[in-house]
Amino acid sequence: MEVPPLKLLLHACCCPCTLEPLRLLLEEGHDIAIAYMNSNIHPAEEYEHRRAVLLDFAREQGLEVIEGVYDPQAWSRAAGVFGTDPDQRPDRCRACYRLRLEEACAYASANGFEGVATTLTVSPYQYTETIREELERACEPHGLAAVFRDYREQYPEATRRSKAMGMYRQNYGGCV
């Protein structure tokens, strides 16, 4: 669904997954700032590495990055309670998406953004429909547009581009 160009906060899970959503959203005419709000990433060194790669890329592109508070204890309270049982993964992921998207929406609302989008749907390993539900749920009380896109088809191009750029590519989503 096309939306008119907005002042948009793009929640980014990592830099490689940001490449294609950012390109496409800029082509749509949105005024974008990137939100790095990912208390799920463990250990802290991995969080910092992904953050540094994203900051370098954003600086090269002339884009602002808004950093959330790194609070793995908040993630543990929200999502860690579901443990590592594979049967609990959908609930754990939902809680993780909720925590991160609520943080992004609260910031967006307080700082004059009109909508929120996320790069989480680039990965074919995520629950895309759950991400849509949580993005809409987080945006609604703030009166923000939930700019949802299913970017799974862009995963191969994001992978190709990030490798061509020599970009750090992690081999796991970040959660413990």
Question: Residue locations for each model-derived region?
Answer:
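Nucleotide-activated chemistry modules centered on ATP-dependent adenylation/adenylyltransferase
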Residues: E2-V176
